[in-house]
Amino acid sequence: MSSPVICISKSETIFEALMLMIQKGISHLVITEKDVPVGVISEWDWMTAQQRHPAALIHSIKSADSAESLAEIRKEMMPLIEQIFEEEGQAESLTRLITEIHDQITCRLIELGLGEMEKKGRGGTPSEFSWMGMGSEGRREQTVITDQDNALIFKDPGPERLSQTRQWFLDFAEKVVSGLEICGFPRCRGNTMAINPELCLTEEEWLKLFGGILQKPTPEALLKAGIYFDFRSLYGKHELVEKLRNKLMDLSPRSRLFLKMMSENDLDAGRPPVQQWGWKIRRLLGFGNLTVDLKQHALRPLVMGIRTLALSAGITESHSLERIRELEKRGELSANLSQALQSAYDFIMLLKIRRNFITHENENLSGNEVSLKQLNPLEQRFLEESLKVILRLQDEVYARFGGIP
């Protein structure tokens, strides 16, 4: 049996056992019932049931010696995820697994980048640091087709060494970002990457940036908040990121103008089309080909609305479903709306993942647009109901904060 010995409750799913093995880097788990060992589950059990095992990918990632090798390993991920998609069919589980594999690729590229800096005579890290994932990566909600959103935080080395230290990290970040690009993660068009000097900052500089966004919520600041405020540490000194998160969660509930502007921005960013007269008439008469942009008109407004509520309540969780559950637990969302939002999120994310697989095979297709004609009647109904739930969320958020003076 692998060491250390980790236990998992008998009530957990096989997928939870798989994720625990991947995260802990072990091949066996002790199954317990009321804290009493009742059995053992291993990688072999998963391989017997599933034919492939994600842990094998993780082992390959950790031993890869180049970005090109990692790119080949990532290609192996696609059929594996598609198989699990067909068998598991749970969006939260799938996005967690996809994100975990992407995290491992990023961490290996960081290790390779650090090694390369030393080989070139640049030395080791000049200060403690953490590589941060932002946006969907920060929320652990990545799908198979995604671009980069990352940043870097480092401990202030003092005014004499600050410029030199920042340049070291910028040069290092270029190696990681280039490696991610080789692995199939395009560079962010908005330059939300650690190679951007505005996102390669000390602790104090990050606090100043976040404070400025909260105090002066201009349209540009709100756009940044929609990406930067979903963040987590992937590698390095995690405490640097947690201190930043705790400070943000202390300030955001008291930033009333920011919350007001965020709620208005949530509406301006786009409303699901399901209640528009054009949609209703065409749906009733069967005219034309109705399409929905799953990112722009479904996931994005859902994520934005939940983020605003989470910031107002000082909730530290970053995954949208975890935020929804915590909001319900705190009485910030009704149980009815909470359950409806969770169902809507799961269904829409599954549609998006399915669309990603189709797009991966045919690059001429959009990865986010889905036509109602491509769905069966039950799926059409579920999609429309999900969009109506998102409209309810937007109205709830605006009613709560839109009128704040």
Q: Predicted regions span which residues?
A:
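Residue-level detector of anion-binding/catalytic polar loops
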Residues: 6, 27, 186
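A glycine-centered beta-loop-beta connector
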Residues: 21, 29-46
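A short, polar/charged loop-to-alpha-helix boundary motif
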Residues: 44-60
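Short, structural beta-strand-to-alpha-helix junction motif
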Residues: 1, 13-14, 66
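Bateman (tandem CBS) regulatory domains
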Residues: 1-5, 147
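The conserved cystathionine-beta-synthase
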Residues: 7-25, 32
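Histidine- and aromatic-rich ligand-binding microenvironments
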Residues: 13, 45-46, 147
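A nucleotide- and high-energy phosphate-metabolite-utilizing enzyme signature
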Residues: 56-405
